[in-house]
């Protein structure tokens, strides 16, 4: 079973160190690629508001954040006609394809077809809607959100198979999209898709961390696990075999110990009711040793000891027998103090001590003790 006490791994660099590296890189080139920023900062549990502050800081330093290779939007625009009109026959199987083996049911298919009919926006349209939103135009909010629903789907499909239904991933991503619509500031010079992507990814990864696993894993650790999985798959293709922890560590630039710990955290809990065997007539729990259970031999010896002890106690007076039963918890496993036993019999604790001492002397007599000695060896 997975341990619910996870030690949060320290990254090779702190968040501030990574940001300093990005700033240094941006100063040399006067710009930074949005994709590079996302990749470097994704292992950290950054709120979108914190990302906004970082982007503003980059702008103050004269570093432009570019999004020249915006794959999300360029792929989505393939669903439109060249004249800019929306295509009623939007091919969601091509644009929003899922990993092999993942099927979509009718509600999802209907949803994808519906959002495929919503025309995408030009950069000028986005700016115009953003201005209206800043003036409190609710219709502009709705229009900007609807035009980017396909962006949510294209991001959500990357997280299929991680413990949440595809439709649930889309729903969580849509919540992030709504947040992005409310907070988007066109004056910063970002395309809306650039800004919204972080909010959408953040909403989905947080939902997976909170809901997908029996044992919750911190968001930043979910990102680290995802990166390890990607590296493992890449090495599997290159090497033609499963990579070793040492090979993964070298590729991720982490220590082997950290990679092993990440792999341990990534393990899913297994139910004790998991069927085992071809007939499914056994369960995993049947094959796990109960460390507290007695062996058959010990159980038999324990039953014999109980029988002999009952016979020996029968040779005492009723009061002596009951005092010993209460003092040593022979019936219910709970021992009582002299004072507690005294209250039961309505006598002083000193009187109970005397009765107990007398009863124990009787039990030590060879005529009685020899019947129990064999069980003490």
Curated annotation (Swiss-Prot):
Disordered, as annotated region: 72-92
| Xref: SUPFAM superfamilies | Sigma2 domain of RNA polymerase sigma factors, Sigma3 and sigma4 domains of RNA polymerase sigma factors
GO MF: DNA binding; sigma factor activity
Renumbered residue ranges of the record's region Sigma-70 factor domain-4: 312-365
Q: Give the start-end ranges of region Sigma-70 factor domain-3.
A: 223-299
Question: Which controlled-vocabulary keywords does the entry list?
Answer: Cytoplasm, DNA-binding, Sigma factor, Transcription, Transcription regulation
Residue segments, region Sigma-70 factor domain-2: 144-214
**Which is one Pfam family of this protein?**
Sigma70_r1_1
What GO cellular component term, any one, is given?
A: cytoplasm
Motif Interaction with polymerase core subunit RpoC, chain ranges: 168-171
Q: Where in the cell is it found?
A: Cytoplasm
Instruction: Indicate the residues that the entry says bind DNA.
Output: 338-357
The family note in this entry says: Belongs to the sigma-70 factor family. RpoD/SigA subfamily.
- Summarize the subunit comment: Interacts transiently with the RNA polymerase catalytic core.
Role played: Sigma factors are initiation factors that promote the attachment of RNA polymerase to specific initiation sites and are then released. This sigma factor is the primary sigma factor during exponential growth.
User: What name does this protein carry?
Assistant: RNA polymerase sigma factor SigA
Gene for this protein? sigA
